[in-house]
Amino acid sequence: MTDLYAVVGNPIAHSKSPLIHRLFAEQTDQDLVYEALLIDTEDTTFQFAISDLIARGYRGINITVPFKLDAFELADELSPRAEVAHAVNTFSFKDGKIFGDNTDGIGLVTDIEENANRPFKDQKVLILGAGGAVQGILQPLLEKQPGLVHIANRTAKRAEVLGKRFETFSPITSSDWEGIPDQAYDIIINGTSASLEGKLPPINSNVVGQDSLVYDMMYGAEPTIFMQWAQQHQPSCQVRDGLGMLVGQAAEAFYIWRGVRPQTQSVIDEVRRLIQA
């Protein structure tokens, strides 16, 4: 019997997750169907929508904007990484219980360490933004033992609060945009959504070194404005968008559900080709 899975969110029509999971299923010879489903909160609640999917026999669900906090609150049991992130992007349904997990961080770490070939260990890391996206990546990143992590945000207080929450994993410094220490970083991660609006975080270009990896968690058909900005200032730096993170978090969810870990680079290449077509 074919197993049912889906991604839920609002909006959802743009989601690449059904394509990604179809490619994973083909690669690993798994019998499943994966759909993108809109949850319209004018017609229903998140809790009712999930109950309906369970009743219809779905085995697991991915959760995207704006329901990751609702998912965190609805889960009967949480993985340690979801508990720390205070957000859930993956549900598994088993024995009448909802298990919540967060695969965003492992998606980013895998993409940077394996696909970009840049281990975090002992590296100087600058993270831009202190919202939900950054919250979800911090624990897996810090477990890789970077040498230094600085979180910068429009409001320094939010960055400071986030840093304190995760300081048991690794020492973290924080500031507003103006307070970023004036030095080059090995890895720079843009966890803001500024690129979606064609905007840049107001930071000094000195943070980009000749050998920096500059990573934007957003992605599109063209290099993001943040990637373009980095290469204008340091043509030799390495730039990468968040498509690999998207595929990486999907691969981790696929592994949770199916017990099989798919290879990601070929899927990244295929999705990129279709986005650019």
Curated annotation (Swiss-Prot):
The keyword Oxidoreductase applies. GO terms for cellular component: cytosol. NADP(+) binds at G129, A130, G131, G132, A133, N153, R154, T155, A156, K157, R158, M217, G242. Its EC number is 1.1.1.25. It comes from the Bacteria. Pfam families: SDH_C, Shikimate_DH, Shikimate_dh_N. One of its GO terms (molecular function) is NADP binding. Pathway: Metabolic intermediate biosynthesis; chorismate biosynthesis; chorismate from D-erythrose 4-phosphate and phosphoenolpyruvate: step 4/7. SUPFAM superfamilies: Aminoacid dehydrogenase-like, N-terminal domain, NAD(P)-binding Rossmann-fold domains. It is an enzyme of class 1 (oxidoreductase). The active site is at K68. Transmembrane segments: none annotated. Shikimate binds at S15, K16, S17, T64, N89, D104, Y219. One of its GO terms (biological process) is aromatic amino acid family biosynthetic process. Involved in the biosynthesis of the chorismate, which leads to the biosynthesis of aromatic amino acids. Catalyzes the reversible NADPH linked reduction of 3-dehydroshikimate (DHSA) to yield shikimate (SA). Belongs to the shikimate dehydrogenase family. Homodimer. This is Shikimate dehydrogenase (NADP(+)). It comes from Hydrogenovibrio crunogenus (strain DSM 25203 / XCL-2) (Thiomicrospira crunogena).
